[in-house]
């Protein structure tokens, strides 16, 4: 949320809890785009129920890391990786950032690897009365089998962006904002927001 607000400073950004009571959204899509759209459409539908669909648009994102040595996993299951069994099924609801990182480290070590090419994907979705839109951003680099740095969340301490020697967990926020997959997706979605400005009286 902070990254979105920092990047879209020309817009008034509200968290869902500032508009209405948060509600559960089941993310059962097979791609980042599908899950991002599921969330944006669900929020837009709620805005319609509250007669706010002409005042707001819904923006959501779905993101994750794909590691080459793991066949692209965890991918869309990045937030639930440690709940995934050997058959690729999600069997629990106890995953944390720490447990997900531990699983990634363990799987790389099981392959006798200290690192692997990897990339982050972020899909930004917008849902409005004028339609639904998506934009993707990517950040390529290397996943490593030891944690370095504590500035961040998720897999930040295990990922070295291309062109850097430090992990995301070791980089400052300003640098990460410039290079992140989410920022790249948000840069593209700005074109969508700009095209919607007249509709919302900007």
Question: Across the structure, where does each feature detected by a protein language model lie?
Answer:
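Anionic-ligand binding patches
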Residues: 1-202
